[in-house]
């Protein structure tokens, strides 16, 4: 850096060339679909999105049938709503492992990643919303000498 800074206010105006910065390109297959995998807890979702009418299919079933709770359906739609693309893409996904909540989180993560593959300019919006970050929280293991991960057996003084 040949430019010298006189104050911290000038730091924002300083431009650094980054030729090694990753270029986010459109990644679609021959059927004009973007594919991504999403993960949450023990669930893994394989997601394909393509331009369409906003239809969501999970494990060959409608989303209303597979995810009966409205909260889970809302969770799946969040990345599309945040990117202002609700009703513009058809989503087809297969999801396995974990429970319904983990599966909904995995589908949401997969939809977010697939959207960035289809439209790389949406990456900033989705990243700011936290949709591209893998939620790394998993169940804590049970320890020996304990009833559960942290719960101790009942203690008796006498």
From Swiss-Prot:
GO terms assigned for molecular function: RNA binding; structural constituent of ribosome
InterPro entries recorded: Ribosomal_Su5_D2-typ_SF, Ribosomal_uS9, Ribosomal_uS9_bac/plastid, Ribosomal_uS9_CS, Ribsml_uS5_D2-typ_fold_subgr
GO CC terms in record: cytosolic small ribosomal subunit
SUPFAM superfamilies in UniProt: Ribosomal protein S5 domain 2-like (SSF54211)
Signal peptide start and end residues: none
GO biological process: translation
One Pfam family it belongs to: Ribosomal_S9
Domain of life: Bacteria
Keyword list, A-Z: Ribonucleoprotein, Ribosomal protein
Family classification: Belongs to the universal ribosomal protein uS9 family.
PANTHER family xref list: RIBOSOMAL PROTEIN S9, SMALL RIBOSOMAL SUBUNIT PROTEIN US9M
Protein name, UniProt field: Small ribosomal subunit protein uS9
Originating species: Rhodopseudomonas palustris (strain BisA53)
């Amino acid at each position: 850096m040949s430019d010298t800074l006189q104050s911290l206010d000038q730091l924002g105006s300083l431009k650094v060339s980054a030729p090694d910065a990753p270029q986010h390109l459109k990644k679609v297959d021959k059927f004009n679909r973007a594919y991504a995998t999403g993960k949450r807890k023990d669930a893994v979702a394989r997601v394909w999105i393509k331009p369409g009418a906003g239809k969501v299919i999970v494990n060959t079933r409608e989303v209303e049938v597979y995810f009966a709770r409205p909260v889970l359906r809302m969770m799946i739609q969040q990345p599309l709503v945040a990117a202002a693309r609700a009703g513009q893409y058809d989503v087809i996904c297969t999801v396995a492992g974990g429970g319904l909540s983990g599966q909904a989180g995995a589908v949401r993560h997969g939809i977010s990643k697939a959207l960035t593959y289809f439209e790389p300019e949406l990456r900033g919006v989705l990243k700011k919303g936290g949709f591209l970050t893998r939620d790394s929280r998993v169940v804590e293991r049970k320890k020996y000498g304990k009833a559960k991960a942290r719960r101790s057996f009942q203690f008796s003084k006498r």
